[in-house]
Amino acid sequence: SGYKTVHVETAGTLENYISADEKEKLIGLKLTGKLNTFDYDFMRTMPALESIDLAQIDNTTIPASCFKESTVKTVIIPDNAFSNSSIISINIPSSVVSIGNSAFDKCSSLAGNLHLPNGLQSIGNNAFRRCGKLTGDLCIPNSVMNLGSYAFNNCNFTTLILGTGITTIPEDCFSYGYNFTGNLIIPDQVEVIEDGAFNSCTFNGYLTLGSGLQKIGYIAFTGVSSSFASGHFNKIYCKATEPPVLSTYLDIENNCKYLGVPIGSKASYRATTYWK
């Protein structure tokens, strides 16, 4: 069929489970059990291999350059792959489609810019939580459809660009982003902003809420120094013709002097709980 699931009981023995014919023809591998450098080196010699699912391997340390110069197009980085490790940099290959839960959680030495490849589809819960030395622009590719709770909590990025594939911004996804500056644009495709999603962030430009937004969760934008987004948005635009459901007041009258809504929607906003 071109695809095979293999359980590797002893690290370094993957080649024992793959016949000579399979080595030449397999397109996809789903691996469980234990792997080491010898197993990754073996996979690099498989000329037709395009997809590797590592989500259920037991030992989660992935060697540097493990897929360099290989034919692999799709890789799943497993849960806890580098969690609480001392890695200082990461170059995520373009073949990666999924980053598992807590994959880089609490990697306090991981520093610099983070480039998320086009083609990435899923970022798990706590994926980059408490990676406090990650800085610069954070761009979520349009290909990403699933973001996990606390995925970028307690990082130090300066700007945030959200892709158009996201429909939900989950709980505390970007919370405690103390270095965020400038504008925040929520794409039209986003329907729900969950509790605490941008809690204690420091944006200081304008905020645009997309036309598809239906609900904003509790303390989604509440912050330390301001009731709305902890920074000081100078203008807020909400493109939704029907007011999104709010879990509490935004108190925008205390922190922002301008709220823009679509033509013909002013009366509806003024009549809606927490917006009026």
Question: Residue spans of the language-model regions?
Answer:
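The feature captures the LRR N-terminal capping module
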Residues: 2-22
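Stable alpha-helical elements in mature extracytoplasmic
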Residues: 14, 38-39, 265
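A short acidic, amphipathic alpha-helical/loop segment
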Residues: 39-45, 248-249
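Membrane-proximal C-terminal cap and juxtamembrane stalk of leucine-rich repeat ectodomains
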Residues: 250-276
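Leucine-rich repeat
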Residues: 17-22, 42-45, 224-227
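Structural signature of tandem-repeat unit edges
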Residues: 2-9, 27-35, 48-61, 67-80, ...
